[in-house]
Structures are given as structure tokens and as C-alpha cells.
Amino acid sequence: MLEKDIEAYLVKRVKSVGGRAYKFVSPSNRGVSDRIVCLPDGTTHFIELKRPGGKVSPLQDMFAREMALLNQSYDILWSKEEVDKWISDHTSTTPQIFCSPATAP
């Protein structure tokens, strides 16, 4: 399985739970995560995707440590199964209803 397949699967799964998975490209900052995931509960997560057997570069490792120091959520996912587990761990099983303040009960 290729990294791009796992990445496409992450995007699809995040959308299926009402979130967004933005491609993160920062030309002057190599090593940043592949995606920034924003979930409906208001949380933001930095996600690096790797194919099984892939390697984390020293710059990616440095970015992971920086995110930890900043108390940010950072994960490396290595397969579609790990994507599914990550989604399960980070989303509620209770449906969430969002409305504007004007229509709130």
C-alpha cells in the first residue's frame, strides 16, 4: 500500500465524520505533517502518514517533538486500519447537532 492511498483514505474518513483534512505544505519548513485535521468537536490534529515500512525523517521527528512541546496533537498513521482506529479514538459515537446561536433551543 502506498502513502498516497492511506492519505486519501484519511481524507475520506475525516469527511465522513464531519471534519476536514487540509493538506499542509510549508516550503520553508520541511518536515511538517502531511495533514492538519480539524474535527467537529473543535480539536485540531497534525497527522503524518507513512506506508508500512516507511521511515520518519529526522526533520519529521523534530517537527513531532516541537508539536509535543507546544501541547499539540500529533500522530503518525501507518495503515488504513490505523486511520480507522484514530478516527474511532478521536470522534464521538453520539451524533452532534450544530446550529447557529439564532436557532439554538
Q: What are the residue ranges of the model-derived segments?
A:
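Catalytic phosphate/metal-binding cores of nucleic-acid and nucleotide-processing enzymes, i.e., regions
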Residues: 1-105
